[in-house]
Amino acid sequence: MKKVAYISNFYAIPPLKGAAVQTWTNEVAKRLWFYEPHTICVDDEFLPLKEYRDGVYHHRIRLSKIYKRIFQKILGWDVYSYNDRVFNEVKKINPDIVHFQNYHNGIESLARKIKTWNKDIKVILHLHNFYDFKNKNFDKLDAVITCSDFLMKNFEYLPNAKFYKVIKNGVDVDKFKKINFKKDEKIIIGFIGRIVSQKNVEYMIELAREFKNLPEYNFKIIGEIIKRKDNYEYYKSLVKKVKEYNLNNIEFLDNISPDKVHAAYNDFDFTIIPLNDKESFCMVGIEAMSCESFVIARASEGSKEYMVDNENCKLFDFDNFAKKVKEYILNLKYPERHRIISNARKMCEENFSWDKIAEDIQKFYKEVLNDTSK
């Protein structure tokens, strides 16, 4: 059986907190029928360095705090870098395909190193976000994958490769589904995502302000509160607004683990998704839709590939967003609501199940492996 090695950075696999790229990797890897899947990623204190789980071999790389402090921060000499350690794992696995998940520093050199060691390994770069590749030299890629047509068409300085393919994100439709329970009589309007300015969380605060005098509505913001300076200042600005508006109908709930996030969507009667223009897909959208939480969004071009206004969601521009959303929610009748969330669920089942995404990627692997051109 041929082997695939998925290489990632930033979060462990499987992810213990919201991480769309690592979720994609884990969900697809454990559904591969025709390939032996391996992941190479950073470590997590709650996970072993080596693990076989759900049919996937996980290889986690630990860089100690002492190493990071002395060699990376003080000396600035990464003598045995993350990429060096990844390369050693690749040599041990000896895969047929190396599948890089998103870009991290030095991938272009690492790809070159892998190809020099074994020219028969197929190297794939899978992009989920925009990056500045103007001065990057990717000369050893066999394929480039993007998560949306929008990203493929609008990625400036897209690396040269023999194959280009769009493969969408997915959702576990068996897990992310409507659970027939009702927690209380209040109508919950929710947001899920990192608490950073790129996620436009301030629109949730403004929406909560619009509903201030309607006690049957509550607002929940679920997402990682990042302590880095700029991000934390943004979070504090949101808290300041809540106090300034004297809001008692909104709460911040810190990050929840991926295996519980489907329950959060089931708690939400409405999921608010105020996307920026650069959002390449938006996994939150299909997760909410799969759970039949009514999606109200400001859509990006990437998310418009599946978000269809008045068909499976409701879309608004940022101009007067909160006022327009309030008016829409207050006037939404059950038949229309039911039609839209049913359409959304059906779309997820037909187009975005992880089984379908895994089937698509395996077909593409076969195409890449069968290529014998130089």
Residue ranges and their predicted role:
Residues F294-A297:
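Short hydrophobic beta-strand element within catalytic cores of glycosyltransferases
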Residues N255, A264-F268:
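Short alpha-helical donor nucleotide-sugar binding micro-motif in glycosyltransferases
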Residues D309-N320, E327-Y334:
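Conserved acidic donor-binding segment of nucleotide-sugar-dependent glycosyltransferases
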Residues K182-K199, I205-R209, K220:
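Conserved donor-binding/catalytic core segment of Leloir-type glycosyltransferases
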Residues F150, G170:
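Carbohydrate-associated surface elements
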Residues S8-I13, R31-I74, K227:
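N-terminal strand-loop element at the rim of the active site
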Residues K115-T116, Y232-I256:
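Nucleotide-activated donor-binding/catalytic signature segment of Leloir-type glycosyltransferases, i.e.
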Residues N218-K236:
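Glycosyltransferase donor-sugar binding loop
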